[in-house]
Swiss-Prot record:
CDD domains the record matches: TopoIIB_Trans
GO cellular component: DNA topoisomerase type II (double strand cut, ATP-hydrolyzing) complex; nucleus
Annotated Basic and acidic residues bias: 7-25
Binding-site residues, ATP: N60, D160, T181, K182, G190, K191, F192, G193, L194, G195, A196, K197, K516
Reactions that this protein is recorded to catalyse: ATP-dependent breakage, passage and rejoining of double-stranded DNA
Protein name as annotated: DNA topoisomerase 6 subunit B
A GO biological-process term: cell morphogenesis
PANTHER family: DNA TOPOISOMERASE 6 SUBUNIT B
Domain of life: Eukaryota
Gene name as annotated: TOP6B
Phenotype upon loss of function: Plants are defective in cell elongation and show a severe dwarf phenotype.
Tissues showing expression: Highly expressed in leaves, stems, flowers and seedlings.
HAMAP family assigned: Top6B
């Protein structure tokens, strides 16, 4: 019995130990969470990871330059790294295969025979087509001989002329997830606040190589160089090298270099579309994009030149609107505030609450609250009361002054610069509000243009960054395709080349989905504003289209009249000749004016050619009078409304010639 008891005790002890191990709490760092859920941040696969890395680095570069009001100059380079070069970078020696059948891409003799036979048949068909003059199809890419585990590697480098980073802050800025400078309430380009940190995590997961950062701030006589990676489990930077170098060129900005696994082939078009759309929404920036391949003919170099020096204002950090806060935020604001009393807290920590309104709110909260009440003494139950009142009370809408839209001028320039449309109209709406957050919708609609397909081509921007994925469910797409009656604006939805550009800026973009790639269609305020902005552009285009149609009809009328001049001249001249003969034989009497004209016909003063000239002059005169009437109705007078000159910078250049037209005066400086 004692032995049995001992056995049972040991079994029980073992069971308790097992339960203890199973119930042991485990924690994950933020870096570990994002490493395991990388699709949330746009790192779904190697191709998407390459695209997202480029996007994060470019947006950081723009933010950095704009923060010091510097016109951005961004250089992006993607360099292809073959397997042998990558192995040498990590110190791995290439090894020949010994057991070939072990590998996923092993090809049996039977499979090889089938492949060769198929290739031979394809070659034979191509030869026959060539002999008969038929056009051959492009040969398909062979599916074989790329191992399942064989990866493609790329070195991504982004250089800017921005603010740079403080020497001591660089390790934490890149090696600690959820630490940064963009967590206040203001309009920001980033979706998660991860920036280059997620690129470093992906580099750590796919190549194991560290990230390299060079940075210098204005007036610094040194350049910081830092090579580091990240301790995923502890969420801290692992510094390999952190030093200062000379800065003889007085350069300021940052250069970031990271080696990652990627797929240029499948995401080439997405990356180039992103760069082009970024050039549309930021025409004041200059982008240089390079792709360097092991095969020189595959190299790509594209320069997106700057079109304007006008930059949007820098977004301003703002305070929370009372209707947009929740209990957690109220608790955090109370914890962080430096104000002593509840009255001061309400007045200074929220927008649209002045001293009078704060006192009224406190009076409405009940006898447990008072203006001089210590804000730090507010209990959890009292916080709930504050929250309930915030949701029920009426507040003025927040101002849109904290936002930084691209601007109608920049949007128009960007569209013209990149698409070269035949017509373009832009519109910038006033600030509106949803859930206590201000937002502004800007829109542009273009007709025609370079590399634009027939039908509706949609370009979406959120906080001045392009959105390229999950377009179908987006509020802009649904509005443009289903809620706009294009025919009523003289626009053919299927035949015309229509570009629809919509940019939404806000302190909180209501993205949908884990990847934050589209804006939902369920917020009526935004949907209404988007529809209105597109319609305003269409109204502008309609007037231009109608004027163009009228001008075309006028030209067609002139061509028609000119085409009938020879026949009309011949018929009239024959009638005049017949009248002259009748007058000579006195078979018919005519008035004095008719006799004078018939006399000129008989003396060959009026001929068929003179009639033709007079009719042509009359058509020209009528055309001129109609054009003048059309110009007057369109708001253009016969004389310039205002003389506007482009003045030479040299004051000594005083010689000029004025060239006048019905719409402007052009002064040519000599």
């Amino acid at each position: 019995m004692a032995g049995d008891d001992l056995v049972e005790t040991k079994k029980g002890s073992s069971k308790n130990s097992k339960d203890s191990n199973e119930s042991k709490l485990k924690q994950k760092s933020p870096a570990e969470f994002f490493a395991e859920n990388k699709n949330i941040a746009g790192f779904d696969n190697p191709g998407k990871s390459l695209y997202t890395t480029v996007r994060e680095l470019v947006e950081n570069a723009l933010d950095s330059a704009e923060s010091i009001s510097e016109l951005p100059e961004v250089e992006v380079t993607i360099e292809e790294i073959v397997k042998s070069k990558f192995n040498s970078m990590i110190g791995l020696i290439d090894r020949e295969r010994v057991d070939t059948q072990l590998y996923d891409d092993y090809e049996t003799e039977k499979a090889r025979g089938k492949r060769l036979a198929k290739e031979a048949r394809a070659s034979e068909i191509q030869a026959k087509n060539l002999a008969s003059g038929k056009k051959n199809k492009e040969p398909g890419v062979s599916k074989v001989l790329k191992a399942r585990g064989e990866a493609s590697y790329y070195k991504v480098t982004c250089k800017d002329n921005g603010k740079g980073m403080p020497h001591d802050d660089i390790p934490n800025m890149f090696g600690r997830v959820l630490s940064g400078t963009k967590y206040g309430l203001k309009q920001t380009r980033g979706k998660f606040g991860l920036g280059a940190k997620m690129a470093l995590i992906w580099s750590k997961m796919s190549t194991g190589l560290p990230i390299e950062i060079s940075s210098s701030m204005k007036s610094q006589n040194y350049v910081t160089f830092c090579r580091l990676d990240i301790d995923i489990h502890r969420n801290i930077p692992h510094i390999h090298l952190h030093e200062k170098k000379g800065n003889k060129e007085k350069w300021h900005g940052a250069e970031i270099q990271v080696v990652i696994e990627g797929n240029w082939t499948t995401y080439r078009s997405k990356i180039l579309h992103y760069m082009r759309q970024m050039a549309v929404i930021t025409p004041y920036a200059q982008f240089l994009f390079r792709f360097i391949s092991e095969t020189p003919e595959k190299n790509v170099t594209i320069k997106f030149t700057r079109r304007t020096d006008v930059m949007p204002p820098i977004p301003i950090e703002t305070k929370h609107h009372p209707s947009s806060v929740d209990l957690l935020l109220i608790k955090r604001l109370i914890t962080d505030t430096s104000k002593k009393t509840l009255l001061q807290f309400l007045q200074n920590e929220f927008v649209n609450i002045n001293k009078t309104l704060a006192a009224r709110l406190i009076g409405e909260m009940g006898p447990d609250f008072g203006p001089s009440m210590a804000v730090k003494s507010v209990t959890s139950q009292q916080m709930v009361r504050i929250h309930q009142l915030f949701r029920q009370a009426k507040f003025d809408d927040p101002s849109g002054d904290c936002l930084s839209p691209a601007g109608e001028y920049n949007l128009r320039l960007g569209i013209i610069k990149e698409l070269h449309p035949d017509m373009v109209a832009t519109y910038s709406g006033s600030a509106q509000v949803f859930e206590g957050h201000p937002f502004i919708v800007e829109a542009g609609v273009s007709l025609g243009g370079r590399d634009v397909k027939q039908g509706i081509n949609i370009f979406r921007f959120a906080n001045r960054i392009p959105l390229l994925f999950e377009q179908g469910a987006d509020v802009v797409t649904r509005t443009a395709l289903k809620r706009i009656n294009w025919n009523s604006y003289k626009i053919n939805q299927t035949q015309d080349k229509i570009g629809v550009f919509v940019s939404i800026v806000s302190t909180k973009i209501p993205f949908k989905g884990t990847g934050k790639e589209y804006i939902g269609d369920d917020i009526s305020e935004i949907a209404t504003a988007v529809k209105s902005a597109i319609q305003q552009c269409c109204i502008q285009l309609k007037s231009k289209i109608v004027k163009r149609l009228q001008a075309r009809e006028q030209q067609e009328r002139k061509r028609s009249l000119s085409r009938y001049i020879p026949d009309a001249t011949g018929a009239v001249y024959e009638v005049l000749k017949q009248m002259t003969e009748e007058h000579k034989t006195k078979r018919k009497r005519y008035g004095e004016e008719d006799i004078v004209m018939l006399d000129k016909v008989s003396k060959q003063i009026i001929t068929k050619e003179t009639l033709k000239e007079k009719l042509a002059e009359h058509v020209e005169q009528v055309d001129y009078e109609m054009a003048l009437e059309y110009a007057t109705q369109s708001g253009v007078s016969e004389e310039p409304r205002e003389n506007i000159y482009l003045q030479h910078l040299d004051p000594n250049k005083s010689n000029f010639i004025d060239l006048h037209s019905p719409t402007f005066v052009f002064r040519l400086m000599l």
